[in-house]
UniProtKB/Swiss-Prot annotation:
Gene3D superfamilies recorded: Dihydrodipicolinate Reductase, domain 2 (3.30.360.10), NAD(P)-binding Rossmann-like Domain (3.40.50.720)
Catalytic activity as recorded in UniProt: N-acetyl-L-glutamate 5-semialdehyde + phosphate + NADP(+) = N-acetyl-L-glutamyl 5-phosphate + NADPH + H(+)
The protein's name: N-acetyl-gamma-glutamyl-phosphate reductase
EC identifiers of the protein: 1.2.1.38
Compartment list: Cytoplasm
Gene Ontology annotations for the cellular component aspect, listed alphabetically: cytoplasm
GO molecular function: N-acetyl-gamma-glutamyl-phosphate reductase activity; NAD binding
Length: 310
């Protein structure tokens, strides 16, 4: 029998992307609740319990409700794309390249929390340095990022695309999360292994999909004052053999005049760059990804495949 997959929230931005991806698969059976019955709690519970894997593409509170509907029904495994369970100790963090053994943890887990798009890039940069002892856990990390506007869901998409929308946004780029209380910070701190709460400054650009995440560091404040080559070597070793995360060669990065946030739009990969100058003792770590790819639906499908042993 084919594994049954239920996408709870398949009409949202991430849910639609996952549904489209799975439509091409003949090794799965995707079960869908009739659109008119989406708010029927009892019927939703039936679909959740009928699934081998339920992928939750819902706001935090709705995801928590969906999980509660499965209490006492442990045969359904869950992938939650919301922020609700990303720092919960009972949930496996769904970043397969996070550390040695993480793929196996995801594959064996019943509960998997899909990472946020911004933390995916930031954690990909800082976690290997922390694990290698280069980045002190109390380093005052700052993360700057720009995302395509689809990351804000249907409401922001409408505000950016519909000129007749009452709250139309004409800006080509805008900062948000100005009080430094973005909901992604807790998972960034926990899974990045940072003792000090990082400063996170997100922004949105006038492009649908794509993302750049930057983490600037002072080499002199890292353990042993490493060279750019050493920092690059740590990242390269950490992601050796990974087919989704690519560490761009140092000499190739040095020749780049720019990095395009949309380069990986529509793709599931992630590129990591090491830029900087040893003359001034500064390095800028950069992650490039699709906010809806490795940053959302692509990661969810990757986690689903791991859970199915594929």
């Amino acid at each position: 029998m084919k594994p049954k997959i239920f996408i709870d929230g398949e009409h949202g931005t991430t849910g639609l992307q996952i549904r489209t991806r799975l439509a091409e698969r003949d090794d799965l059976e995707v079960i869908s609740i009739p659109e008119a019955e989406r708010r029927n709690k009892d019927l939703r519970a039936d679909y959740l319990r009928a699934a081998d894997i339920a992928i939750l593409c819902l706001p935090d509170d709705a995801s928590k409700e969906a999980v509660s509907l499965l209490e006492g029904h442990n045969s359904t495994r869950i992938i939650d794309t919301s922020t609700a369970h990303r720092v919960h100790p009972d949930w496996a963090y769904g970043f397969a390249e996070l550390a040695k053994g993480q793929r196996e943890r995801i594959a064996e887990a019943r509960l998997v929390a899909n990472p946020g798009c911004y933390p995916t890039g930031a954690i990909a940069l800082v976690r290997p340095l922390c694990d290698a002892g280069l980045l002190p856990a109390d380093y005052p990390v700052s993360v700057n990022a720009v995302s395509g506007y689809t990351g804000g869901g249907k409401q922001l998409i409408a505000q950016m695309e519909d000129r007749n929308h009452p709250d139309y946004l004409a800006a080509n780029n805008f900062l948000y999360g100005l009080p430094l209380k973005h909901k992604h910070v807790p998972e960034l701190q926990l899974h990045g292994r940072l003792d000090r709460r990082p400063i996170f400054s997100p922004s949105v650009g006038r492009f649908p999909q794509g993302m750049i995440v930057q983490v600037p560091l002072f080499l002199s404040e890292l353990e042993g004052s490493p060279s750019l080559a050493k920092v690059h070597a740590v990242l390269t070793e950490h992601y050796a053999g990974q087919d989704i995360v690519e560490v761009v060669p140092l000499e190739e990065s040095a020749k780049l005049p720019r990095v395009d946030a949309e380069e990986l739009a529509g793709k599931d990969g992630m590129k990591l760059f090491v830029f900087g100058t040893e003359d001034h003792g500064q390095v800028n770590l950069v992650a490039l990804l699709d906010n809806l790819g490795k940053g959302a639906s692509g990661a969810a499908v990757q986690n689903m495949n791991l859970m199915l042993g594929k």
